[in-house]
A protein has these predicted regions:
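Glycine-rich phosphate-binding loops of nucleotide-dependent enzymes
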Residues: 1-157
């Protein structure tokens, strides 16, 4: 069998005396789709936040393509090819679609921000995935459905 693209081994996450994840194992192979199901408070978001670098496991290992990695922050996850569509939107309302998608990964031209390149990138990924959206629209002016598209495009960028 081929190497899993993502493996979470014996993940434990504690917050003080409360154990949110207790020995969780998850293996994902290329092309698979998984659903993480459970009641409110079951630890689903906590588990995914560890995979995305928003939280550090108390113990356990995360492997990407067979290599153990440490997720210190979301940038580490993104660099490892992991994106996350958040349950609660992580968008800055007064910013444009483009500004929200490239936030933290802004293209530069010398020391200046290259918003033309950023906008072009947003148009390209939205067309590639069939998620058309106005790259210049402000988040506060678009529907919740369009905001969800922005979250998806952020994960795909």
């Amino acid at each position: 069998m081929n190497t899993p693209v993502i493996e979470m081994r014996n993940i434990v996450k504690r917050f003080g005396n409360f154990t949110a994840n207790d020995g969780i194992n998850l293996t994902v192979h290329k092309g698979e789709i998984h659903a993480i199901l459970g009641e409110n408070g079951a630890g689903k978001s906590t588990l995914m936040n560890q995979l995305y670098g928003l939280l550090k496991p108390t113990s356990g290992d995360i492997l990407v393509n067979g290599k153990k990695i440490v997720m210190n922050n979301p940038r580490d996850a993104i660099d490892a090819g992991i994106g996350m569509v958040h349950q609660h939107f992580m968008l800055i309302q007064p910013f444009t679609v483009t500004e929200n998608i490239v936030l933290g990964t802004e293209p530069t031209k010398g020391v200046k921000l290259d918003m033309a390149a950023a906008r072009k990138n947003v148009v390209e990924i939205s067309e590639r995935y069939g998620l058309s959206i106005d790259p210049d629209a402000k988040i506060e002016d678009i529907s919740v459905g369009m905001q969800q598209r922005v979250e998806i495009l952020k994960a795909l960028d």
